[in-house]
C-alpha cells in the first residue's frame, strides 16, 4: 500500500504547488454589484482609459483614475487616483505607487510586495463579460452558453418569470443512435424560495428509431425540487431508457459529436441504461457542491448503426463492443470543487472532481474480453470504484500560464469491475501521441494483453494520467495607416501551447496476466505511455501535433480540439 500511495503522490506533486495568497474573491461568476461598479468607473469622463498593453513608466505621474481593458497594465510610476484592470493582469514594478484603490477583475497582481498601494486592493478572478458601445462599456446580462448549446434545435421558451417550456433538444451524434433528439416539455417554476422543475421527453434516434422493425425510442422523465437560490439543497428523481457513454471524462460531448458527424470517428463506446435514480445535491459555497445518488437500472449492449458522416463516409464505423448485460444497483457520492476564474478559458484556480461508486448486481451475459483479463462472472457482483480528476491553473506571467492535471481512477475493492466501469488511457483526450484503439499486445492503453475483442473496449481496472501544459498568449493582427491613423483590419487572439503527457492503465484482479499489478502497488514509471506536443489554440478550436516518446515507431499525430485540452 505504501508503494501505491507514494507513487500516486509523485504523480500529483506538480498539482500541489500553492496558489498565490492575496485579497481575492474566487468564484464562477462576478457579483453584479462589482460589475456595475467596474462599468461606472470605466465610463467616468475623468478616467484615463486604455484597451491594450499599457505602461506607466518610472517618473510619470498620472493625476486621476486609470482603467485598462485587456491589458496587461505595467506600473513603474505614480497614479494619484484609483486603478482599474478589466480582464487584465497588473504588474507592479519596484517603486510603483498607487494612492487610491486597486481593483482587478479577471486578472492577477504581481509585484505588490515591491510597490505602495494607498487604498484597498480587491481581486475578482471571474472575467467581466461586457459589450463596448463606442467608448462606453455595458455589462452583459447573460452568462455564456456551454459549448454543447449549438446542438439545440426547435427550442421555444415562454419568457414569463415563473415558467419555461422547451419543446426539443438534441444530444451527442454517435455511431449507435445517430442523432438522439429529445422531444417533450420541460416545465420550470420559480417559487422565490427555490424552484420546481419537471421534464418528460421521448428520445427519438435518427439511426434506429425509423429503420428497425421494432421502434427504438427511449425516454427520460424526471423532476427536482430546489430549496435556496445561490446556495441550497436539491432533491430529485428520474426514470430513463437511454444510451450512455462508457468513458465521458476524456473528451467533451461537442468533440465526440463533431468527430462522429464530420469524420465517422467515434471516440466513445456505448451501452443501454434502463431504470430509475434518486438524488440529493448540496451547494453550500460558491465553489463546491456535493451529490449523492442511488440508481436501480438494467444494462445491455448496443450495436453500432451506420449513420451518415460528412467526410470519410465510405469508411466503416468501429464496432461498438459487446459489454456486460445485467441488473445493477449503483450508489454514487460525488464532490466537485471549482475555483477557476473562468469556466471555458481558465488561467487561475483549482478544479476537483472526486467520485466514489459502489455497485451490486448480477451479470446475465458477460461481454468478451482479452485472454486472462478476468474469469467469466458468475453469481452476484459487488464492486467499489473511485475516480479523481484534479487540475491546477497557474498564471506565471501577464501573458503565460502553466497548467497541470492529474487523473487517478479505478477498482478499490470487491469483484472485478464490469466492462461498463472499466477505463483506458487512449486517444486525443489523454496521451494523444498514440493512435486511438491501435492494435498491439500488452497494450497499457486499453489493457488488451493479446487478442482484443471486436471494437477493442476499455479493459483496465486502474489508470493514472499526468498532463502538463504551458500556454502563452498569441495575437495576430493586420493593420494599415490611412490619413496618419493606424487601423486594424484583422485580428486573432489565441495562444501557442507546449504540452507533455504520461499515463497508462493496468489490471489488479488478473493473476498471471502481464498487465496485472499488485493491488497495493503502482506500475514502474518506465512503463508509462509518454508524449510531447504543441499547437495553436484560438479559443473555440485548437490544432495540435503530438509525438510519442515511449514508443518511437509511433507516427506524428495531428488533431483538433474544441476549446482547451483540459
List where the protein language model places each region.
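Positively charged n-region of N-terminal signal peptides that target proteins for export
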Residues: 1-4
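Outer-membrane beta-barrel initiation region
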Residues: 21, 25-30, 34-44, 51, ...
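Solvent-exposed coil/turn segments that connect beta secondary-structure elements
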Residues: 71, 88, 95, 107-108, ...
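Transmembrane beta-strand segments that form the barrel wall of outer-membrane beta-barrel proteins
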Residues: 163-173, 194-210, 215-223, 237, ...
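C-terminal outer-membrane beta-barrel translocator/porin domains of Gram-negative envelope proteins
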Residues: 231-279, 309-500, 506-508, 558, ...
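Outer-membrane beta-barrel "beta-signal"
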Residues: 333-335, 533-534, 538-540, 554-566
